[in-house]
UniProtKB/Swiss-Prot annotation:
The gene is lpxA. Homotrimer. This is Acyl-[acyl-carrier-protein]--UDP-N-acetylglucosamine O-acyltransferase. GO terms for cellular component: cytoplasm; membrane. Pathway: Glycolipid biosynthesis; lipid IV(A) biosynthesis; lipid IV(A) from (3R)-3-hydroxytetradecanoyl-[acyl-carrier-protein] and UDP-N-acetyl-alpha-D-glucosamine: step 1/6. Involved in the biosynthesis of lipid A, a phosphorylated glycolipid that anchors the lipopolysaccharide to the outer membrane of the cell. InterPro entries: Acetyltransf_C, Acetyltransf_C_sf, Hexapep, Hexapep_transf_CS, Lipid_A_LpxA, Trimer_LpxA-like_sf.
Amino acid sequence: MKETFIHPTALVEQGVELGQGVSVGPFCHIQSGAVIGDNSELMSHVVVTGATTLGTGGKVYPHAVLGCDPQNNKHKGGPTKLNIGANCLIREGVTMHKGSDSARGYTSVGDNCSFLAYAHVAHDCDIGDYVTFSNNVMIGGHTTIGHHAILGGGAAIHQFVRVGHHAFVGGMAAVVSDLIPYGMAIGVHAHLGGLNIVGMKRSGMERKEIHNLRHAVRMLFDRTKPIRDRAKDVLTAIPDSPAVIDMIDFINVDTKRAYCTPPLDAVHGGAGHDSGED
């Protein structure tokens, strides 16, 4: 394993925990209490506060700022955290805030995530594994992003919104409602534009499951009954599909948000346009 390297111009305060093989580049500032995992690299001009844990194998590009106070007037300055998983790529100018003491108290990022330039993660968010934030993505506080979700450039996610796993948010979309697993949100404000077929195929999902999900979405969003009643009908019609069960479990969680739905004209013809062909 390579030796840990700290550039002479970097400021690493007493009380920082550096793993083996860490590289800290010019003009970085790592504050007391921070934990930097093995083989992580901070290129230059990176700020890591003492509230932050960065997992093994992370790579952080210039001018990223990790673990500063939440932009939340309810936060009173109590001890809170930012936890970032292993093998995360954090590009130039990315900002991630720690949790707030008026809520759960920590912001969490999973493993193998990519945050492209100037993306922002707000306080108390929960981000899964293998998530991609394209340039200038912004997510509000208390947002949940599921595993393998992809957020296109400039997308904005409202606070408390849930984005399901394997979902896709189009570039410049403004999402103010929960987005179902495997769903594709497009537009301002974003609507459900179909299913993320490309993402499902990339994940190795079988053709039968993709067809099950298409059938489920058509039933869920036909607007003839309340959505919870439609969810029961879906499980009756498609009882043995793990992907459909995931989607219905997502629908059945009580939250403060509505759901991304297809435009009215799309509902009459199905459930919008899928992001790919089957």
